[in-house]
Regions:
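Alpha-helical segment proximal to the catalytic Tyr-Lys
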Residues: 124, 168-169
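Conserved Rossmann-fold SDR core element
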Residues: 27, 84, 160, 170-182
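Residue(s) in the substrate-gating loop at a strand-loop-helix junction
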Residues: 139
């Protein structure tokens, strides 16, 4: 499949395993250079090595997306190491936290606040690209009520709204914004 992504650069949060790593490998197979981040150094290093073995450039760092300085430093380092940024995928989620204040707080900080911070940090690079794009990895929990992980669904709904607004706000700058809910 040719997605016309050869020589483009995409950053993906939470990309050392799972859906994030699968996206990184798919983009690398299309000829994309990839920025990887996650919280585990061994997993980040293994993911970077696997992507580089596919014949493209990869840059990875240990990042806790709730740490603004770390998140912004990763974005800047990726832009420098990979020669700019054409796309950004907001993939990290705190997941199914308890329906307690701590669960709400961790989901808000990792999902919503980190996505907002990342979009603000990556926006200048995407404006400089001829194909700037942002993708948010959502969930059907943003649209349907599920028993259990209430904070998760609420934050995914907030992200769906936020990225919908960003699609309108960033369109004049030539930046596409989409949400995908696997």
């Amino acid at each position: 499949m040719d997605l016309q992504l050869k020589n483009k650069t995409v950053l993906i949060t939470g990309s050392s395993k799972g859906i994030g790593f699968a996206m990184a490998k798919t983009l690398a197979a299309e000829g994309c250079d990839v920025g990887i981040c996650a919280r585990n150094a061994d997993e980040v290093n293994a993911a970077v090595a696997a992507i580089q073995a596919m014949g493209v450039k990869a840059h990875g760092q240990v990042v806790d997306v709730t740490d603004s300085a770390s998140l912004e430093a990763w974005i800047k380092a990726c832009a420098e190491a990979l020669g700019g940024i054409d796309g950004f995928v907001a993939n990290v989620s705190a997941g199914g936290a308890d329906n307690e204040e701590s669960g709400w707080r961790s989901n808000f900080e990792a999902d919503v606040l980190a996505s907002w911070k990342a979009v603000n940090a990556v926006k200048p690079y995407l404006e400089a690209s001829d194909c700037g794009s942002i993708v948010s990895i959502g969930s059907t929990a943003s649209l349907e009520a599920f028993a259990g992980a209430v904070p998760y669904g609420a934050m995914k709904a907030a992200l769906l709204n936020y990225f919908g607004n960003m699609a309108q706000e960033l369109a004049p700058a030539g930046i596409r914004v989409n949400s995908v809910s696997p």
